[in-house]
UniProtKB/Swiss-Prot annotation:
Enzyme Commission numbers on file: 6.3.2.8
Listed pathway(s): Cell wall biogenesis; peptidoglycan biosynthesis
Any one of the GO BP annotations: peptidoglycan biosynthetic process
Record family assignment: Belongs to the MurCDEF family.
SUPFAM superfamilies in UniProt: MurCD N-terminal domain (SSF51984), MurD-like peptide ligases, catalytic domain (SSF53623), MurD-like peptide ligases, peptide-binding domain (SSF53244)
Protein's gene: murC
Gene Ontology cellular-component terms listed: cytoplasm
Descriptive protein name: UDP-N-acetylmuramate--L-alanine ligase
UniProt binding sites for ATP: 114-120
Keyword flag Nucleotide-binding: yes
Species for this entry: Lactobacillus johnsonii (strain CNCM I-12250 / La1 / NCC 533)
A GO MF label: ATP binding
């Protein structure tokens, strides 16, 4: 249990989720510190900025439960020196999800789950609600903020290994249910069952995308509101106007016009995410004029269609690594840059996912002006596999395999938008390319 009279010690504090959580607790007035590997990571920057002590792993860091509340990262097992020290000293620990659940219960809480769009929607919801009321948030890209006395707590609910089943929020947005994480979930039914349990644990209302049949099939004892573009949706986006600066649209709540909203975001998925945010805010009786203002100042989530310009070349950095996300990112790029050559540099993420979605990846990349595929990013759990980037390229006319040693090939593209897509270490390819511009 969290306790302001004890030190909150994080084993693995540099993990993206753990770093975010440490920042939230620090902001909420807890005494936070932690440890991790010595290697420098981007997540330690905000920790250091906040004055949170980050040490190397050392058994001496572990005291007693009378002095410390230990939060252990999911990746660390008995071979970690601090985990071993906990076992030797009979010191109990709690998990990341257990700790988040404690914060969930302190607030009017809104979880955002789904295969795609979690980070973007969580970021948008946290920003918009934060403009009208004190709001704490926890986002999967390494960002977290606590506000003492906050009304709302907005958090990204990750389905991997069923972590989100530790949570019992007031509200939950579910963006979609596409099968993912084949290394853990047996099949689509197994995956969907996790979302059914998450829905069962939501207290006040569920907000789901109306076009997703699996979301539609979820059984709930609480109100389940749909959002989308159809007349049958409870919250419907209508009169949509897309331009190269973003999108404008009205939202109807059960047929009632809530007004016209403008976002500096691109693609249908951004309109859907925004409609979900508006639906939650409306249900919590947040004034719509405040929501409109908040939407106008939102700049986007980290690594979600993040843009830089170099003369006539625009570079987009995006986390997309699943077919649905890739299609959304490409649609957004075409909306914002209709007159530029669309070049995609895609890093397949894990061998199992690449094998499962090979045909989808090939179909998507055949539709861009030029496709490059990097070597497959291997995960710690899956170091090799029986598929390669060459297998994809062989089925995509005009495409090429690209690596750091031939990254200069990208410089031949002029008046182009170059989209780097992937969830691994693809920023290293982008950095190498940008140094040549």
């Amino acid at each position: 249990m969290l306790d302001k009279n004890k030190q909150i010690w994080f084993i693995g504090i540099k993990g993206t989720g753990m770093a975010s959580l440490a920042l939230v607790l620090h902001d909420l007035g807890y005494n936070v510190a932690g440890s991790d590997i010595e290697k420098y990571t981007f997540t330690q920057v905000p920790l250091e900025k906040a004055g949170i002590e980050v040490k190397n792993f050392d058994p001496a860091n572990i005291k007693s439960n009378a002095e410390q509340v230990i939060v252990k990262g999911n990746a660390f097992k008995q071979d970690n020196p601090e985990v071993a020290a906990c076992l030797d000293k009979n010191v109990e620990w709690q998990s990341y999800p257990d700790t988040v659940e404690e914060i969930v219960q302190m607030h009017t809480s809104i979880g955002v789950s789904g295969t795609h769009g979690k980070t973007s929607t969580t970021s948008l919801l946290a920003h918009v609600l934060g403009e009208v009321a004190p709001t704490s948030y926890l986002i999967g890209d390494g960002r977290g903020k606590g506000v003492e006395g906050s009304r709302f707590f907005v958090y990204e609910a990750d389905e991997y290994r069923r972590h989100f089943l530790a949570y019992h929020p007031d509200y939950q947005i579910m963006t979609n249910i596409d099968f993912d994480h084949p290394d853990y979930f047996k099949d689509q039914d197994d995956y969907t069952s996790a979302f059914q349990t998450a829905a069962d644990q939501t207290k006040k209302a569920l907000f789901v995308w109306g076009d997703d049949k699996r979301l539609q099939s979820l059984k709930t004892d609480i109100p389940k509101y749909t959002y989308g573009f159809k007349d049958t949706d409870d919250f419907q986006a209508v009169n949509i106007e897309k331009t190269t600066t973003g999108s404008k649209f009205n939202v109807l709540a059960h047929g009632k016009d809530l007004g016209r909203f403008e976002i500096h975001l691109f693609g249908d998925h951004s309109i859907l995410n925004t409609t979900a945010v508006i639906a939650v805010a409306y249900t919590e009786k947040v004034p719509m004029d405040d929501i409109k203002e908040g939407l106008l100042t939102f700049k986007g989530a980290k690594r979600r269609f993040a843009e830089k310009d170099f003369g006539d070349v625009s570079v987009i950095d995006d986390y997309a690594h699943h077919p649905t996300e890739m299609r959304a990112t490409i649609q957004a790029a075409r909306q914002k840059f209709p007159d530029k050559e669309l070049v995609v540099v895609f890093q397949p993420h894990t061998f199992s996912r690449t094998k499962k979605y090979q045909k989808d990846f090939e179909e998507i990349l055949r539709d861009v002006d030029k496709a490059y595929v990097t070597p497959i990013y291997a995960s710690a759990r899956e170091a090799s596999g029986d598929i390669s980037s060459e297998d994809l390229v062989n089925n995509i006319p005009g495409s090429e395999v690209i690596d750091l040693d031939n990254i200069a090939d990208l410089t031949k593209h002029k008046n182009a938008v170059v989209v780097f897509m992937g969830a691994g270490d693809i920023p290293k390819y982008e950095d190498a390319y940008e140094k040549l511009l």
